[in-house]
């Protein structure tokens, strides 16, 4: 025997659908066997999916897990390494990996290092393991680790001392910008340092606000990247180990994505998986003629198909003719269902009802917000009637400073751009236009000064700093946790910094009520950034 073949199942589990996941794993294992694979590896917790959250606490989980094992035992003549929930008679619950062949479990590994930071809270559910698992197959010595374990140098060193040749790493590692590259760079050095081959297999797919990019890879013991799977694609991949050369055969990697392309593909996949797995027949959104809704429309159409997307332009007195024209033209180019619904009657009715209560109070943002809420009411009405999911179109910059209207433009079940700064929105729109022969987003949408069009001649910069300045301050404050004085020391205007930070801090209540959206950064407005709504904390200077 000159070589053996490993199958890497870059798998997108349906969280909690244990029977379906197990059946699909059986199908993939059988397909791998047809391709003469000797071993197939699946992601972390692949039987139930990651993160299963409090589904892990359901009393009948163990029974369902045992049923899944019976399904998986049907597979013959190939070794399977897969993730599952291991519950002991003593009541301990582990994040585990099983090695199975011909229906026999050859070994079980319990994850040692349980992450409890950022989006992770595994200590809520699991106990840590302490033993290593090493198995020999086809004359080759394999070790098994699960996700966080590979980042613990002590855990990896302990395993390497057992003379393993290849470490199989099962992962459910969420995406953020730059993370696929970071994994490869860091683990390349580790493989050289410990003189072991690494097979890194990652989950793929969108799950609520998390994105799993896949981006699986194999690194030879000398640091050579032998295989690199595409990002954001569910597929079976194969790699051969040359026994004589003692290395995995080099396969040309998938073309690398630049940052903007990577972000765009991640948002498309996240939107597709959220809509489809939530059971919606399609989506609906307000198409204003502005860049945020234009980009959201493009992502939605790319994710689920233009025939399942409905866009509604809802003009009012302050809506420019340019906006109507651009929205109409984009809808035509993309082939989505499109309609125009005037909101004058709704807003006027609101005004007439409220005027007796307003008395002589001067007009202010209240009247502007009524326009946004009229639009939100229309979208939710259409959603209720036809069963389509409303997509919220706001971006991270606006959400950070509260430049949005509760129960207005914030309505919706999924906020596609929730973790995307406005400056990146522009880059994504330009990128999307390069993907088709005819640009789908009219050029004027990209080049016009942004405006909410809620009052005459309104521009976003009437209320906010220029977006390049705003986003730089926000990134320093949110992603980097820098203090007010540190940000000012970078050269930003003191009053501008104070205003931006004040807006961020006072709008936590709005963000809590917003729809979830895909996480692409290390500090999204979701699981990893949690501040009390009511608090007396003030900037340190």
Curated annotation (Swiss-Prot):
Catalytic activity entry: deamido-NAD(+) + L-glutamine + ATP + H2O = L-glutamate + AMP + diphosphate + NAD(+) + H(+)
Keyword Nucleotide-binding attached: yes
Chain's gene name: nadE
Family to which this protein belongs: In the C-terminal section; belongs to the NAD synthetase family.
Source organism: Acinetobacter baylyi (strain ATCC 33305 / BD413 / ADP1)
Pathway named in the protein's UniProt entry: Cofactor biosynthesis; NAD(+) biosynthesis; NAD(+) from deamido-NAD(+) (L-Gln route): step 1/1
Record-given protein name: Glutamine-dependent NAD(+) synthetase
One Pfam family it belongs to: NAD_synthase
HAMAP family linked: NadE_glutamine_dep
Binding site for deamido-NAD(+): 369, 398, 510
């Amino acid at each position: 025997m000159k070589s053996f073949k490993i199958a890497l199942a870059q798998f997108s589990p349906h969280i909690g659908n244990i029977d379906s996941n197990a059946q699909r794993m059986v199908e993939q294992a059988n397909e791998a066997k047809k391709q003469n694979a000797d071993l197939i590896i699946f992601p972390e917790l692949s039987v139930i999916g990651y993160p299963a959250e409090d589904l892990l606490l359901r009393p009948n989980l163990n029974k369902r897990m045992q049923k899944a094992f019976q399904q998986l035992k049907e597979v013959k003549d190939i070794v399977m390494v897969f993730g599952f929930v291991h519950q002991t008679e003593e009541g301990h619950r582990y994040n585990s990996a099983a090695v199975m062949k011909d229906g026999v479990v050859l070994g079980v590994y319990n994850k040692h290092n349980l992450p409890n930071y950022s989006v992770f809270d595994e200590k809520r559910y699991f106990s840590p393991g302490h033993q290593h698992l090493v198995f020999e197959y086809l004359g080759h010595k394999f070790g098994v680790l699960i996700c966080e374990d590979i980042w613990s140098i002590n855990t990896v060193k302990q395993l390497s001392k057992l003379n393993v040749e290849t470490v199989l790493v099962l992962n459910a590692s969420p995406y953020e910008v730059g993370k696929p590259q970071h994994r490869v760079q860091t683990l390349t050095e580790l493989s050289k340092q410990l003189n072991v081959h690494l097979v890194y297999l990652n989950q793929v797919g969108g799950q609520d606000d998390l994105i799993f990019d896949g981006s699986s890879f194999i690194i030879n013991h000398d640091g050579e990247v032998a295989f690199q799977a595409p990002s954001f694609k569910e597929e079976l991949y194969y790699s051969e180990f040359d026994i004589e050369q003692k290395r995995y055969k080099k396969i040309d990697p998938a073309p690398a994505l630049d940052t903007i392309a990577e972000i765009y593909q991640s948002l498309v996949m996240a939107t597709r998986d959220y809509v489809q797995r939530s059971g919606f027949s399609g989506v609906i959104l307000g198409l204003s003629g502005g860049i945020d809704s234009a980009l959201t429309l493009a992502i939605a159409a790319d994710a689920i198909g233009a025939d399942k997307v409905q866009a509604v332009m809802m003009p009012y007195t302050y809506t420019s003719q340019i906006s109507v024209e651009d929205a109409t033209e984009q809808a035509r180019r993309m082939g989505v269902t499109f309609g125009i619904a005037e909101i004058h009657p709704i807003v006027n009715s609101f005004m007439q009802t409220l005027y007796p209560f307003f008395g002589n109070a001067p007009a202010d943002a209240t009247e502007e917000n009524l326009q946004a809420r009229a639009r939100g009411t229309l979208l939710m009405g259409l959603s209720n009637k036809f069963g389509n999911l409303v997509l919220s179109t706001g971006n991270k910059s606006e959400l950070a400073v509260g430049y949005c209207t509760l129960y207005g433009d914030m309505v919706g079940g999924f906020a596609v751009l929730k973790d995307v700064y406005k400056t990146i929105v522009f880059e994504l729109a330009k990128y999307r236009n390069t993907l088709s022969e005819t640009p789908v987003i009219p050029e004027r949408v990209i080049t016009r000064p942004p405006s909410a069009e809620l009052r005459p001649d309104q521009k976003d910069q009437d209320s906010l700093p220029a977006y390049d300045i705003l986003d730089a301050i926000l990134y320093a404050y949110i992603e980097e946790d820098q203090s007010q004085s540190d940000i000012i020391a970078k050269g930003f205007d003191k009053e501008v910094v104070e205003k931006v930070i004040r807006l961020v801090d006072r709008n936590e209540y709005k963000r809590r009520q917003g729809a979830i959206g895909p996480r692409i950064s290390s500090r999204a407005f979701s699981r990893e950034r949690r501040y009390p709504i009511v608090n007396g904390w003030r900037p340190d200077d």
